[in-house]
């Protein structure tokens, strides 16, 4: 069974793409087959972290949206490219061409697009997880992605605007009947050590905090040099994100069982 997950944040600069890329690799290390989709179509950047060049992407999501290629043309298997010993990672990237970005902003795309892509990946590539890396904020694209996904992972920094925005985002997702979990990212080290932080924040934002990622300067400086966890598997960041990956597997497995039992009645 394929689980679709949206990685989202209320504001930009919270580390969505960094988290998505590293999370995908860690899920693969746990034996999962993962597809990551750069749905930040107006400002794509996930390919940079994966070290995927424009020459490697013969076609993009933009081409598929406008019927210029087949679905198989836009799915890039980067398992060997990343030298992963287990699992699999597929990448679907967006165009960096200005004219393509302008076109999709002006014309948009079908509201069924997200679900269609997830279903194709499930049927043709047998993936365990489809992860959408979205554009920050509350906009039509985000809501379409949320409506098409099983679970949302909200990244939040520890400042007032982010806390308020994450609470609002979570409440909107609840109205759509969608489950959301929160990861606190770039948390000041002294604050991250507080054992009460997850429960205190959970009460404020009315959502479960499933992980804390302290701020590390080296994460920022490494962004354009590849997936951090692959180069630094023993780093505390990698260890913490691995715990989040395992927790996500537990949570989505529980949700799947609940759905199956409900459907069986």
Enumerate the language-model features and the residues they cover:
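Phosphate-binding loop that captures ATP/GTP phosphates
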Residues: 33-34, 42-91
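P-loop NTP-binding site
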Residues: 204, 208, 218, 239-265
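Cytosolic-facing regulatory segments adjacent to core modules
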Residues: 72, 81-82, 88-136
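Conserved catalytic-core segment of NTP-binding enzymes
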Residues: 113-215, 220-221
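Short, well-ordered alpha-helices that flank and scaffold nucleotide-derived cofactor binding pockets
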Residues: 25, 29, 48, 147, ...
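Conserved Rossmann-like nucleotide-cofactor binding loop
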Residues: 42, 97, 161
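C-terminal boundary of histidine-terminating zinc-finger modules
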Residues: 223-239
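Walker A/P-loop phosphate-binding motif and the immediately C-terminal alpha-helix
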Residues: 2-42
């Amino acid at each position: 069974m394929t689980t679709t997950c949206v990685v989202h944040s209320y504001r930009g600069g919270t580390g969505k793409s960094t988290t998505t890329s590293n999370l995908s690799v860690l899920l693969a290390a746990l034996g999962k087959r993962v597809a990551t989709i750069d749905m930040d179509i107006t400002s794509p950047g996930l390919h940079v972290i994966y070290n995927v060049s424009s020459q490697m992407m013969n076609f993009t999501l933009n081409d598929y949206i406008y019927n210029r290629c087949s679905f198989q043309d836009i799915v890039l298997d980067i398992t060997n490219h990343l030298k992963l010993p287990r699992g699999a990672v597929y990448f679907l990237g967006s165009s960096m061409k200005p004219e393509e970005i302008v076109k999709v902003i002006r014309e948009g795309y079908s509201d069924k697009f997200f679900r269609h892509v997830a279903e194709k990946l499930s049927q043709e590539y047998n993936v365990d997880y489809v992860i959408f890396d979205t554009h920050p904020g509350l906009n039509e694209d985000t809501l379409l992605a949320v409506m098409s996904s099983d679970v949302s992972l909200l990244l939040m920094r520890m400042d007032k605007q982010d806390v308020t925005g994450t609470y609002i985002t979570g409440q909107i997702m609840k109205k759509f009947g969608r489950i959301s979990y929160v990861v606190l990212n770039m948390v000041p080290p002294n604050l991250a050590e507080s054992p009460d932080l997850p429960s205190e924040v959970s009460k404020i934002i009315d959502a479960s905090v499933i992980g804390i990622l302290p701020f590390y300067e080296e994460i920022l400086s490494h962004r354009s040099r590849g997936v951090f966890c692959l180069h630094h598997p023993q780093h505390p960041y990698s260890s913490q994100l691995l715990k989040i990956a395992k927790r996500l597997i537990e949570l989505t497995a529980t949700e799947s069982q609940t759905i199956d039992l409900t459907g069986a009645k």
